[in-house]
């Protein structure tokens, strides 16, 4: 079941496409929000064509929303996108999206999964921090935590899956300033490294100290820190030789590369998220 939906948020008309796993109501199921990267032609449809979230919706019983950023980008808090410069309130939009889908289809208000790539990954960090009572799990692909968000303190723990390629030329895995592709790469706001980003979220979620659980293949390695508040986890996944890509993406017209095919990122996000969809009450962070 597929529906185009329009709403008003932050004084602006906004839109998103909604995929439900079966005909009729999506009552009592989680919602996954998929955020595209920054490009004048970027849209939710691009991520729908590029990923397998529609198929995963059927397998996992999730509803999936594909929102459109204004001008093909998100106001992710770095202050450098056209949406940031125009004062777009994308946090308000995504909050309204969650509320709208819950009101119409009965999806959980406090167990949302947000997945994004690049500018969408930065936005995923932001919404996880600023709407942590609604977002239970987020996945950031090719996008570390924006340095501008480091002082944000969420009210609830949020599980994090962080996926980054070692050869990313746009948003370096070691952090620093993100750049557009091309010989005159434009500085696009400073971000933390994958290790620093994982450390930040481990601290937020109050995961116990320690090296975490490690798994590795010929093409990637993954370190998962369990034991956060409400059972939250933080997984840092390094893709060896991976560029600024969504691993396992489908090829589509205009795509320069689709990245490693060792795993399907959409499937892995759903596998990670499924056991971590804890209520807001169980994820609430006590204040010292």
Each model region followed by its residue ranges:
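Short beta-strand/loop motif that positions the catalytic acidic residue
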Residues: 162-164, 168
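Flexible "cap/lid" loop of the alpha/beta hydrolase fold
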Residues: 144-160, 175-178
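Mobile gating loops/cap/lid regions near enzyme active sites that modulate substrate access
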Residues: 230-256, 260-263
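Short alpha-helix in the alpha/beta-hydrolase fold that links the catalytic acid
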Residues: 47, 173-182, 186-203, 212-225, ...
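Acidic catalytic loop of the alpha/beta-hydrolase fold
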Residues: 168-171, 244-246
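Serine-hydrolase catalytic machinery in alpha/beta-hydrolase-like enzymes
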Residues: 3-113, 117, 122-130, 246-258
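A domain-start/cap signature at the N-terminus of enzymes
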Residues: 1-31, 55-56, 109-149, 195-199, ...
């Amino acid at each position: 079941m597929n529906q185009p939906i329009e709403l008003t948020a932050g004084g602006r008309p906004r839109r998103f496409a909604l995929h439900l796993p079966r005909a009729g109501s999506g009552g009592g199921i989680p919602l996954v929000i998929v955020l595209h990267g920054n490009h004048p032609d970027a849209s939710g449809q691009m991520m729908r064509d590029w990923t397998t979230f529609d198929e995963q919706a059927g397998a996992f019983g999730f509803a999936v929303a594909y929102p459109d950023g204004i001008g093909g980008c998100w106001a992710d808090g770095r202050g450098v996108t056209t949406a940031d410069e125009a004062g777009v309130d994308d946090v308000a939009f995504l909050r309204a999206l969650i509320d709208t889908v819950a009101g119409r289809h009965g999806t959980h208000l406090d167990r949302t999964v947000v997945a994004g790539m690049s500018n969408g990954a930065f936005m995923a960090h932001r919404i996880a921090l600023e709407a942590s009572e609604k977002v239970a799990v987020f996945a950031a692909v090719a996008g570390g935590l924006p340095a501008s968000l480091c002082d944000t303190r969420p009210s609830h723990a949020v599980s994090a899956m962080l996926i980054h390629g070692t050869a990313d030329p746009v948003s370096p895995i070691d952090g620093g300033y993100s750049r557009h592709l091309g010989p005159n790469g434009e500085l696009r706001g400073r971000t933390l490294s994958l290790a620093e980003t994982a450390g930040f979220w481990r601290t937020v979620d109050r995961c116990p100290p320690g090296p975490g659980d490690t798994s590795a293949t010929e093409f990637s390695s993954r370190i998962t820190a369990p034991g956060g508040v409400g059972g939250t986890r933080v997984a840092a996944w390094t893709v060896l030789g991976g560029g600024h890509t969504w691993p396992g993406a489908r090829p589509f017209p205009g795509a320069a590369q689709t990245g490693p095919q060792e795993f399907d990122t959409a499937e892995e996000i759903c596998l990670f998220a499924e056991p971590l969809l804890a209520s807001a009450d169980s994820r609430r962070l006590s204040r010292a």
